[in-house]
């Protein structure tokens, strides 16, 4: 199923369009790889999608189980490797504490988050670490 279209704009930039919604965004190569770093790089999007996916799965889990889910923020840290240049590690620092869940609920929510499709796709190739607070 086609989901998007990507066009090269020149100067190491691309335009990405989501076909269903029409939403668009630009990517730019990072400064450490010949770009200007003026927008998300493709690997930034990869790393950020992990946090976004985990939050989405938490939301789905909470909706299905009648659990209030109001607050969540995450910091995304991406560590690159060389030879070949690739994402070696993604660290997600996810703040869930403002939801006031008991320990049992928090454990179940975290377990659900770790089943997100992005993590399941990446986990054998990229070191993934979560820090839940």
Predicted regions and their residues:
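Extended beta-strand/beta-hairpin segments
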Residues: 1-48, 59-133
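Alpha-helical metal-binding/catalytic segments enriched in His/Glu/Asp
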Residues: 53-54
């Amino acid at each position: 199923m086609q989901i998007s279209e990507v066009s090269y704009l020149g100067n190491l930039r691309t335009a990405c369009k989501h076909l269903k919604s029409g939403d668009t965004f630009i990517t730019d190569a990072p400064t450490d790889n010949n770009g200007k770093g003026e927008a998300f790089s493709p690997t930034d999007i990869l790393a950020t999608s992990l946090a976004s996916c985990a939050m989405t799965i938490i939301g789905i889990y909470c909706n299905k189980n009648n659990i209030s889910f109001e607050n969540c923020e995450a910091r995304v840290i991406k560590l690159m490797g060389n030879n070949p240049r690739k994402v070696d590690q993604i660290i997600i620092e996810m703040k869930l504490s403002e939801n006031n869940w008991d320990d049992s609920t928090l454990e179940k929510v975290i377990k659900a988050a770790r089943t997100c499709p992005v993590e399941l796709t990446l986990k054998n190739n990229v070191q993934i670490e979560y820090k839940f607070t």
